[in-house]
Amino acid sequence: MKDDVLKQQAHAAIQKKLGYAFRDISLLRQALTHRSHHAKHNERFEFVGDSILNYTVARMLFDAFPKLTEGELSRLRASLVNEGVLAEMAAEMNVGDGLYLGAGELKSGGFRRPSILADAMEAMFAAVSFDADFNTAEKVVRHLFADRVRRADFQNQAKDGKTALQEALQARRFALPKYRIEEQIGYANDSMFVISCDLGELGFVCRAKGTSRKAAEQEAAKEALKWLEEKLPLKRKKK
């Protein structure tokens, strides 16, 4: 009974920070339910929420930075829409207090796990769209990301590893890299991935580890990019 009251209080606080009050509170509960809880969970919600988030931030950047190219806008969006930023935002909103987790996840500190927090944020954007409509969900995203977009500085945003490697290979007219899972160590909720990055005709393959597939791919891409720039530096055009 006490846990129910605490969850209700947490959900009320989350809605206040979202700037939106749910008519159907069960949608918010599902958005905050991890698959380990063995109930209606939030994975399908994430699918919709990810699209809402990416579109909205893309439009915000499009309007805020009229002189940036498509590639520059994509990199800037990647610096704002990622697991780290979403998890940070969720922590600021105390989303972890409102999560429904299975016993194993709860014991291992799942309410602090960045991937779980980030997924819950995306799921909540979807839940708002289901409870109201797309425009309302867009307003919620704009409300949460307004300050971050205002502070965004393209010149200080480092390209993510995979994007930088792709552009470097294209500039040298080589095929795109291939990523493959070489090994997955540990259990589903506490895994370590080993990913290989293969540069094909260049004959270079490297491996990297990460706590998620995406993180490992980024690290492998950075290693491959370092090798590429050392072995095949681009000649600067004379002015």
UniProtKB/Swiss-Prot annotation:
Residues at the catalytic site: 50
PROSITE patterns, A to Z: DS_RBD, RNASE_3_1, RNASE_3_2
Entry's Gene Ontology cellular component terms: cytoplasm
Keywords: Cytoplasm, Endonuclease, Hydrolase, Magnesium, Metal-binding, mRNA processing, Nuclease, RNA-binding, rRNA processing, rRNA-binding, tRNA processing
GO MF, one example: metal ion binding
Location(s) in or outside the cell: Cytoplasm
Any Pfam family: dsrm
EC class (word): hydrolase
Chain positions recorded as Mg(2+) binding sites: 46, 119, 122
Swiss-Prot/TrEMBL catalytic activity: Endonucleolytic cleavage to 5'-phosphomonoester
Keyword rRNA-binding on entry: yes
Gene disruption: observed consequences: Altered processing of 3' end of CRISPR crRNA and tracrRNA, but no effect on CRISPR interference during plasmid transformation.
Residue ranges constituting the RNase III domain according to the UniProt record: 11-133
Function: Digests double-stranded RNA. Involved in the processing of primary rRNA transcript to yield the immediate precursors to the large and small rRNAs (23S and 16S). Also processes some mRNAs, and tRNAs when they are encoded in the rRNA operon. CRISPR (clustered regularly interspaced short palindromic repeat) is an adaptive immune system that provides protection against mobile genetic elements (viruses, transposable elements and conjugative plasmids). CRISPR clusters contain spacers, sequences complementary to antecedent mobile elements, and target invading nucleic acids. CRISPR clusters are transcribed and processed into CRISPR RNA (crRNA). In this organism endogenous ribonuclease 3 and Cas9 are required for correct coprocessing of pre-crRNA and the trans-encoded small RNA (tracrRNA).
Name of the protein in question: Ribonuclease 3
Species whose genome carries this gene: Neisseria meningitidis serogroup C (strain 8013)
Lineage: Bacteria, Pseudomonadati, Pseudomonadota, Betaproteobacteria, Neisseriales
Gene, per the UniProt record: rnc
